[in-house]
Every structure is written in C-alpha cells, then in structure tokens.
Design a protein with these regions (language model features):
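Short loop/turn motifs at secondary-structure junctions
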Residues: 15, 43-44, 72, 152-154
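Anion (oxyanion) recognition and catalysis
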Residues: 11, 69, 149
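Short beta-strand segments at enzyme active-site cores
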Residues: 45-50, 158
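Conserved beta-strand segments of alpha/beta enzyme cores
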Residues: 16-18, 109, 154-156
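Acidic donor-binding segment of Leloir-type glycosyltransferases
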Residues: 1-20
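Acidic donor-binding/catalytic loop of UDP-sugar-dependent glycosyltransferases
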Residues: 1-4, 51-67
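Acceptor/aglycone-binding surface of glycosyltransferases and processive sugar-polymer synthases
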Residues: 22-24, 28-41, 46, 58-138, ...
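Hydrophobic helical membrane-anchoring modules
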Residues: 131-213
Length: 213
C-alpha cells in the first residue's frame, strides 16, 4: 500500500519523521489540515506544505523556509514560473481561479490561488480552519488564502519553477474537484458581501499611504 511505501521511504531518508495516517482518504485539504494540527501539537510554530506530484522545484523549499523566518507572521506562498509544458486549459483555469479570488477579497493580494507550495504560521492558519476554512478537497488551497486576506493575515510570495511532466500523475479529479471549487467560489463571493465595508476601508487606508506594518 502507499502507507507501507511511505514508511519505508521515511525510514530510509527521514528517520524519526512523523507520518500521520488515516483509515480513509480525507482529500488534499484534509491531509494538509491533519499535518498542520499534528505539527502544532508537536510544538512547531510553522509548517511547510508541498504537493506530492513533483511539479515544484525542490530548491524553492530553502527560499520558502528562509522567507518564513524573516516574515514569521505571513503565509509564504509559491508564485509559479511555468515551463512550456503547461496546457492552455490549466493555465487559464489558474488565472480564472486567481481572478475570482481577487473579486472575493476586493484586492489583488493573492498572486496565485492554487500553488501548493507554502509555509504557514500555524496558530493563525489553524484559527482560520476552525473559523470555517476546513475544506477537505482541492478547494482548501484557494479558500484558505481568501480567508487569510479577510482576516488581514499578510501574504508573501516566492517565485517557484513549476513543471508538469508529460507522463506525470495528477490527483485532480476534474468533475468532482471542479464542482467543489465552483461551490467554493459561490460561497466566498457571498461571504465577501458582509465583509466588503471592512475590506474596502482597509483598501482605502493603504491607498492613502498607510501600508501594512
């Protein structure tokens, strides 16, 4: 099974690492949340999320970690630099998702809503999860950033080279996950409406020269 293979890899390359197991597949968001909660329970203040499909340049991990040390209160997000293998459908879907995130936050703070390489300040992000951001599927990545902007948690971006191998494996289920993401955008657009006075006031303050501390 995949768990047995993971245990062997950890024993070989990272002895002492904690592997969080579940009886059933909870989805990407469920796996990330479980990892964040386990890291906090173990006494860590921050955790790094990285997709398991090999699309992100592992050299970027050092930059993500370094920026998290410099800006410990911020979510450090990968900003993809794509190679020529990205399909037009995938590219425009990412752009549409990010564009909708701008509408949901009344800002352009979110540069890329889908990149799965990030460093999270655990207390702040787990508070968002408990406050309604507990999304268990592929909708976790964009929704947690939208909720972070709503909560005025700053974001910081690091360029990450992203490559999609021609014979690579994707865990994205087009029908199911597109349904979850479409429903997520509907919820967030309606969730933005009662928050819009605060979001607009914050935007005006920054336009008048009162930057984020």
């Amino acid at each position: 099974s995949s768990v047995v293979r993971l245990e062997k890899l950890l024993d070989e390359h990272a002895p002492g690492a904690l592997l969080v197991k579940h009886e059933q597949n909870l989805g990407k968001g469920g796996a990330v949340i479980s990892g964040l909660e386990a890291a906090r329970a173990a006494g860590y203040s921050h955790a790094i999320q990285v997709d398991a499909d090999g699309q992100h340049d592992p050299k970027a991990l050092e930059s993500i970690h370094g920026q998290s040390c410099i800006y410990p209160d911020r979510i450090i997000c990968g900003q993809p630099v794509f190679d020529e293998n990205i399909s037009r459908v995938r590219y425009y879907f990412r752009f549409l998702t990010t564009y909708l995130a701008w509408a949901e936050t009344l800002s352009t703070e979110i540069k890329d809503a889908l990149c799965g390489l990030r460093a999270y300040p655990l207390d702040a992000v787990l508070k968002l999860v408990r406050g309604g951001g507990r999304r268990l599927r592929m909708d976790f990545d964009p929704e947690i950033l939208v909720r972070a902007v709503w909560a005025d948690i700053p974001l910081h971006y690091v360029s990450v080279h992203v490559s999609y191998p021609v014979d690579g494996t994707s865990h994205f289920q087009y029908i199911r996950d597109n349904f979850y993401i479409s429903w997520m955008h509907t919820r967030l657009l309606f969730g933005m409406l009662p928050r819009s006075p605060v979001l607009l006031a914050r935007k005006v303050k920054r336009m008048l020269g009162r930057p984020r501390p």
